[in-house]
């Protein structure tokens, strides 16, 4: 069974380096694409899904923003099973800060340059909300194109979808980005932060074995 995997905003496949995937799963990592100028979200999702063969069975795994993307792909090309990790099933899972950001539209006036690699304030914020106690957080945050980052943040804030109960959700109880109190996940990673694929790989590996094993 093929398993297509999409990482979180700004993160590459290395965030999954500690995960032991079920034997028999053929892993295919879908790397982030830089959005075209003023690209619509639906068009971007189509481009991210181009490597998927709709004529054969497959599963999807998405982390954080990747979890949102795989749900949108699933609407277009139904998967055998979809698991989202440290992500949300619907807008109700967003934090209060995200809701304030969406309503205020402040993100629209923030210049793209504010998200470049030399932006100390932005990357300090990333460290704080992902895992403030992990000094290696930026090791996994390698996709740093400023237009991609700003565009992605806008799409997360604007994302609107009806919850699909068939989606399997794994959440961490100390996640600041997508607080667990706003969701009703299938699995809870105790003591996990938004960086749980790295710090709680053993627990997540066991869940993936349970859900994907034997498919």
Range-by-range predicted roles:
Residues 1-56, 104-115:
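Active-site catalytic motif of lipid deacylating hydrolases and related acyltransferases
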Residues 61-70:
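Gly/Ala-rich beta-loop-alpha elbow adjacent to hydrolase catalytic centers
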Residues 18, 72-73:
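Active-site signature of alpha/beta-hydrolase-fold catalytic machinery across serine-
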Residues 30-32, 187-192, 198:
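Short glycine-rich catalytic loops that host catalytic nucleophiles or stabilize transition states
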Residues 38-39, 192-207:
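Catalytic histidine-centered segment of alpha/beta-hydrolase-like enzymes
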Residues 115-157:
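Conserved alpha/beta-hydrolase catalytic His-Asp/Glu region
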Residues 169-171, 175:
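Short beta-strand/loop motif that positions the catalytic acidic residue
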Residues 78-113:
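Flexible "cap/lid" loop of the alpha/beta hydrolase fold
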């Amino acid at each position: 069974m093929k398993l297509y995997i999409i990482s979180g905003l700004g993160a590459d496949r290395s965030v999954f380096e500690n995960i032991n995937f079920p034997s028999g799963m053929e892993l295919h990592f879908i790397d982030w694409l830089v959005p075209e100028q003023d690209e619509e979200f639906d068009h971007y999702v189509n481009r991210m899904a181009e490597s998927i063969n709709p004529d054969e069975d497959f599963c999807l795994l998405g982390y954080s923003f990747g979890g949102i993307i795989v749900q949108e792909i699933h609407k277009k090309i139904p998967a055998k099973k979809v698991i989202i990790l440290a992500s949300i099933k619907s807008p109700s899972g967003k934090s209060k800060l995200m809701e304030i950001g969406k309503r205020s539209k402040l993100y629209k006036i923030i210049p793209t340059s504010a998200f470049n690699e030399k932006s100390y304030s932005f990357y300090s914020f990333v460290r704080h909300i992902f895992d403030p106690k992990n000094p290696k957080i930026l090791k996994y945050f390698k996709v740093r194109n400023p237009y991609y980052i700003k565009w992605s943040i806008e799409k997360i804030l604007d994302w609107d979808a009806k919850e699909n109960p068939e989606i399997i959700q794994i959440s961490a109880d100390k996640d600041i980005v997508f607080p667990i109190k706003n969701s009703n996940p299938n699995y809870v990673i105790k003591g996990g932060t938004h960086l749980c694929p790295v710090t709680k790989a053993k627990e997540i590996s066991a869940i993936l074995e349970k859900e994907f094993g034997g498919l």
